[in-house]
């Protein structure tokens, strides 16, 4: 898995921190430069976390992409991006439905909605995923309950 994040705020920070503190933390991570301070801090803390020059570079270099932007800017951020059919996109945007996200990121075939909580940084708490996806259940299962 080559994991990328579009949006670099508290939730992205929590997921990356939980992932990198797990026993098997070999998943490379590519962050969007959206929040320079958070992105730079994570890249300094973890050697296999890098900051991309822009959001499109995240998409071009990753097969799994988590959307972690605020709902009010999501449509604008996603509008100019070129997604691939083979991307697996995980939307962390609570107020947009899976169907709304799928329409914004066509031609992506695999869209999962996930709702983790910030305590995922400590590998605690539960993450709701919909629809059930074994790969994402295994990923989030390393960070808490699914």
Sequence positions of predicted segments:
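NAD(P)+-binding Rossmann beta1-loop-alpha1 motif at the extreme N-terminus of oxidoreductases
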Residues: 1-53, 61
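Short, hydrophobic beta-strand segments that form beta-sheet elements in well-ordered domains
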Residues: 29-34, 89-91, 127-131
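Hydrophobic/aromatic beta-strand patches that form the interior of the parallel beta-sheet core
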Residues: 30, 52, 90, 112-114, ...
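Short, polar loop motifs at secondary-structure junctions
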Residues: 34-38, 95-97, 131-134
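A short acidic, helix-capping loop that chelates divalent metal ions and anchors anionic groups
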Residues: 39-40, 120-124
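Rossmann-fold NAD(P) dinucleotide-binding segment
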Residues: 51-105
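Internal alpha-helical scaffold of NAD(P)-dependent oxidoreductase catalytic cores
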Residues: 100-110, 125-146
